[in-house]
C-alpha cells in the first residue's frame, strides 16, 4: 500500500487528519514562495499554492500519495498576510473587526500514478467589532504567529467569531470532508 506524505509543516493539519483516522506515513513540508501574483485573487491563489506544494514534494516521493493545502484569509479581493509580527497581526485584526471575511482553502492530492485531484473550499467568517483593548490583548498573546489572517479560530480568537458559514476545519487549516473525498476517490485506504 502506498504511503501518504503530508506536504505541510502545520501541526494543525496533522492533528486534523488524525481526527479522521488518517495517519500520514511521512511529513515533508514544501518550501514555495507564497507571495500572491500581481492581481491574483484569493481562490486562484490558494489553488496555485496547494498544487505548487504538492508538486514540489511529489518529486521527492515517487509512488506515494502527496497531500498539500494552503489557507488564505481574504477581505473582499484582498489577501491578508500570514502574521509574522505583532504589527501585522494588529493590522489584520483591524481589517477583520466587525466584518465578514472569507477563508479559502486549497487542497491538492497527487496519487502514486500521477493523477492530480484539487478542491477549493470557502468558509465565511464574521468577527464582532473588536475594541482596541481586545486587539492589543490578542496581539500580545502571540497566538497569531504564522497564521493566515493573523488569527487562530481554534484558540483565543474563537471569542471574536460571531458567525461561521461553511467548514470549520477549513478555517483551522484543512477541510476534512473534501480531503476525505479526494483520498477516497483516489483509492487511499487508511
From Swiss-Prot:
Entry annotation: catalytic residues: 70 (proton acceptor)
CDD domains reported in the protein's UniProt record: Maf
GO cellular component: cytoplasm
Known EC number: 3.6.1.9
Signal sequence range: none
UniProt KW keywords: Cytoplasm, Hydrolase, Nucleotide metabolism
Matching InterPro entries: ITPase-like_fam, Maf-like
Cofactor: a divalent metal cation
Record's catalysed reaction(s): dTTP + H2O = dTMP + diphosphate + H(+); UTP + H2O = UMP + diphosphate + H(+)
UniProt-annotated location(s): Cytoplasm
Keyword GTP-binding on entry: no
Top-level taxon of origin: Bacteria
Site positions (Important for substrate specificity): 12, 71, 154
GO molecular function, one term: dTTP diphosphatase activity
GO biological process: nucleotide metabolic process
Location (main, coarse): cytoplasm
Xref: SUPFAM superfamilies: ITPase-like (SSF52972)
Gene3D superfamilies from the UniProt entry: 3.90.950.10
Cited PANTHER family: BIFUNCTIONAL DTTP/UTP PYROPHOSPHATASE/METHYLTRANSFERASE PROTEIN-RELATED (PTHR43213), BIFUNCTIONAL DTTP_UTP PYROPHOSPHATASE_METHYLTRANSFERASE PROTEIN-RELATED (PTHR43213:SF5)
Entry similarity comment: Belongs to the Maf family. YhdE subfamily.
Function: Nucleoside triphosphate pyrophosphatase that hydrolyzes dTTP and UTP. May have a dual role in cell division arrest and in preventing the incorporation of modified nucleotides into cellular nucleic acids.
The protein's name in its UniProt record: dTTP/UTP pyrophosphatase
Amino acid at each position: 500500500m502506498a504511503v501518504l506524505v503530508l506536504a505541510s509543516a502545520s501541526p494543525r493539519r496533522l492533528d486534523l487528519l488524525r481526527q479522521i483516522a488518517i495517519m500520514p506515513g511521512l511529513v515533508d513540508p514544501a518550501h514555495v514562495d507564497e507571495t500572491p501574483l500581481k492581481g491574483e485573487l484569493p481562490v486562484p491563489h490558494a489553488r496555485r499554492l496547494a498544487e505548487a506544494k504538492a508538486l514540489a514534494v511529489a518529486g521527492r516521493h515517487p509512488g506515494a500519495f502527496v497531500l498539500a493545502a494552503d489557507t488564505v484569509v481574504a477581505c473582499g479581493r484582498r489577501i491578508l498576510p500570514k502574521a509574522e509580527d505583532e504589527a501585522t497581526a494588529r493590522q489584520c485584526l483591524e481589517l477583520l473587526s466587525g466584518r465578514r471575511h472569507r477563508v479559502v482553502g486549497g487542497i491538492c492530492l497527487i496519487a502514486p500514478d500521477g493523477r492530480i485531484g484539487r478542491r477549493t473550499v470557502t468558509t465565511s467568517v464574521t468577527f464582532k467589532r473588536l475594541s482596541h483593548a481586545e486587539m492589543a490583548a490578542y496581539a500580545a498573546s502571540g497566538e497569531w504567529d504564522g497564521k493566515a489572517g493573523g488569527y487562530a479560530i481554534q484558540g483565543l480568537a474563537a471569542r471574536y467569531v460571531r458567525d461561521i458559514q461553511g467548514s470549520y476545519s477549513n478555517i483551522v487549516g484543512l477541510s476534512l470532508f473534501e480531503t476525505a473525498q479526494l483520498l477516497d476517490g483516489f483509492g487511499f485506504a487508511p
